[in-house]
Amino acid sequence: MATRIKILPEQLTNKIAAGEVVERPASVVKELVENALDAGCSEVMVEIEAGGKRLIRVSDTGCGMTREDALLALERHATSKIANDEDLFSLATLGFRGEALPSVASVSRFTLATREKGSLEGTEIYAEGGRIKEVKACGMAEGTVISVRNLFFNTPARLKFMKSSETEAGHVGDLLTRLAISRPDIRFIYTNDGKTVFRALNADLRERVATLLGRTLSQDLYPLDFCDGQLNVTGLVGKPECSRSAASHVYTYINGRFIRDKVVQHAVLQAYRNFMERGRYPVVVLFISVPAAEVDVNVHPTKHEVRFREQGRVHDAIQEAVESVLRSSPWVKTQPVVQKTQASTSIAAARIAQVRESLTQYRPQKTTQQSFKMSTPAVPASFRETSLPDPVPVADAAPAPEVERGYFSGLSVIGQFNAAYILCQDGNSLVIIDQHAAHERVAFERLKTQHAAMGVESQRLLFPETVEFSFKEGAVIREHQTELDRVGFSLEEFGGSTWLLNAVPHLLSGNDYVKTLRDILEELQSLGRSRSFQDILEDILARIACHSVVRGSHCLSQQEIKALFQQMDTTEFSSNCPHGRPVLHTLTLAEIERMFKR
């Protein structure tokens, strides 16, 4: 017989509802801070301990609540923000469902202290697992203070899914960054385990972005102000060269609410399509303002997705707004193709690297035209012996493996095509070699060998470089600092969101190593419980290898080609680059003759 249908007890339904609203400590912070903003506060302070697992405390200077309202606030679907159907489609607040406080209280030890403006005393309510244990009067400043202790103490299954304290703190910092950017007129203070992570004072948007994302980045952002009827788009648009490997720095807001909407993101990427390489994401802060009746925010539990009444019009307006800034910006006028910007940056980086070489005498001087960094004798002798052998006759090598390993050295070089492909003859066949892919494979195998031995060889910088990271990136660095050191990046905290970069992988010296590091951090942020650093180690080494070699067209001398082929002969899997792309393609004489109908 089938199980009878029955009504679930309230305590169980509260936990089920909490699962939709409260996913991790950052979810709690989101709900509490949004309530504070809706209350008209001028300052929000967020304090956490153990990444929010032990304590989350949010204090605000908002309007506060009476004793009766405070008790009602812990009842499900009790809210002061909407009253009828019409209000649901003309929302002017971040919250409106009346689910946040009871959901949080049902999975924690919860304390709410509040005092309404003009009242002589406040009210303090203590609840445990959703049940109110104590209500009393208290003395406090006007506003509200909510403390959430021992999150998920009564739902151990959910507790198991939480990450390390550093990771959870990073998520909280990332969440607060989004909220603080949306309201530069409000002071935000964030502390973790008693240490102030950031203090964002009242400021304009650019200054707020500088505080949270870094002053260097803020200087590469251009203002945007676009109007199309009742649709307004304002904010800051980043240079294409500030791109990221993920959409973590695409901050989009609809009527003040942070969203991750596919329509909006597609419009932004379309605007950048001619200025940025595929697979990269820009840095933008966009505020989209439309009449409340033109957008539905009640389509997802987290309210990150929205539905526009005129989706096409919104998409086109956003794309046009961003494109208008990109078309008129100085870097586009002087260098209309982004590759030229990257090339000039590479030249400048190369010159800096050459000055460092001369000062430190770390490695023998090389010519500025040399593109293949792996051929420099700066690595330990053990690696030079296997990866960079001196030119020797093929006959001197061991006879058994020589047929396979000497393939590339045995090719007859015809020349280069488009300064990117090496044309060779092998008997009656034409062999076309992608020199960039070949360099990548050699560099990748060297990095793997170094990492397996004593770690990737690093190059200490003459002067440590200060780099500003987001709070989420900083949390990733702290969690994986040892592993990052083994792949060549030596970092130490310098205060706030600034870190000192002391050393970089040797193969990246002279290249944009900061961009490579940011890409690696983006990759590490995507790690789940089922994946570890070791699982993506080869992806990281492949990224370093890719960024270490010359991209695009570059003429190679006969000696450089010879050195490359010698290294290819001693490299495993030399037929493909680390990303799986082919290194060479062969056309037989018969195939060529068929092309010409012979």
UniProtKB/Swiss-Prot annotation:
Pfam families attached to this UniProt entry: DNA_mis_repair, HATPase_c_3, MutL_C
Keyword Phosphoprotein: no
Family named by the database record: Belongs to the DNA mismatch repair MutL/HexB family.
Organism: Geotalea daltonii (strain DSM 22248 / JCM 15807 / FRC-32) (Geobacter daltonii)
Keywords: DNA damage, DNA repair
PANTHER family on file: DNA MISMATCH REPAIR PROTEIN MLH, PMS, MUTL, DNA MISMATCH REPAIR PROTEIN MLH1
Function: This protein is involved in the repair of mismatches in DNA. It is required for dam-dependent methyl-directed DNA mismatch repair. May act as a 'molecular matchmaker', a protein that promotes the formation of a stable complex between two or more DNA-binding proteins in an ATP-dependent manner without itself being part of a final effector complex.
InterPro entries, per database record: DNA_mismatch_repair_CS, DNA_mismatch_repair_MutL, DNA_mismatch_S5_2-like, HATPase_C_sf, MutL/Mlh/PMS, MutL/Mlh/Pms-like, MutL_C, MutL_C_dimsub
A GO BP annotation: mismatch repair
Domain of life the protein comes from: Bacteria
Protein name: DNA mismatch repair protein MutL
One GO CC annotation: mismatch repair complex
SMART domains cross-referenced by the UniProt entry: DNA_mis_repair (SM01340), MutL_C (SM00853)
Keyword GTP-binding: no
Matches recorded under HAMAP family: DNA_mis_repair (MF_00149)
Any GO molecular function: mismatched DNA binding
CDD domains: HATPase_MutL-MLH-PMS-like, MutL_Trans
